[in-house]
Amino acid sequence: MEAALSLRGLLVLGVLLGVFAFGCDFSSRREPSEASGATINKRPVAIAHRTFELAAPPADMPPLSSGENAQCDSNFVSNASVRGETRQTDATHATVTITRIKVTLGLNINIWVPTDATQRVIEHEDGHRQISEYYYQTADKLAERIAASYMGKRVEITGTDLAVESSKMLQQMAREITDEYNRELNPEPTQLLYDGITDHGRNEANVKDAVAHAIKNVAVESTQPSSNPGN
């Protein structure tokens, strides 16, 4: 039995790195509003179970790697919206203070199995789902910590059009927030360790035990050098 690595390359963590919103309150002198702060919007996990014919997989299904016949496609979504208040010092210089950050999180899981999939294959892919959901459980705490590190930050900007420069800076900061979230979340090593324990669903390893072992031991076992590099 064979099962796909659930990550589809890099778990599609970066799929929305470039999707963000930003805002700018541009004024010469203005105190932060009472509504200032960081807000995390964590959406419920969305799960879809899909079946397909191995000989004719649907167009919207991610391609299977060689030797695979199923996969759990986990898409972690992160969108950041950053707002700041600008204090202009002269015609071409200003200081932007970050006053509000909103981060929206999501996890979309599509489990793809062939119509003739065995129960072991189905259970193996569900193990990948469990790992993804484990990491998503505390994703809001991670996003909150990252957003908090940007709140109140002051950034100097220069240019002939300070409104444009402020928007560019806020846009870049939104990117940085989602980049950091995706980098720190990173369930990929755990998913890879799980596949190693179960041989992609081909051995008799208990799924529940394999998931628990991968989560508990990933920090140690994922850093050990492979005895067969490149395999």
Which residue stretches match the model-derived regions?
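Bacterial N-terminal signal peptides that target proteins for export
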Residues: E2-L11
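Bacterial N-terminal signal peptides
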Residues: V12-F20
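Bacterial Sec-dependent signal peptides at the C-terminal "C-region" and cleavage site
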Residues: F20-E34
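Metalloprotease/metallohydrolase-associated module, dominated by Zn2+-dependent proteases
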Residues: A38-T97, V103, Y150-N231
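Active-site scaffold of zinc-dependent metalloenzymes
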Residues: T92-Q119
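Short alpha-helix carrying the canonical HExxH Zn2+-binding catalytic motif
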Residues: T118-G127
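Catalytic Zn2+-binding segment of zinc metalloproteases
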Residues: D126-L142
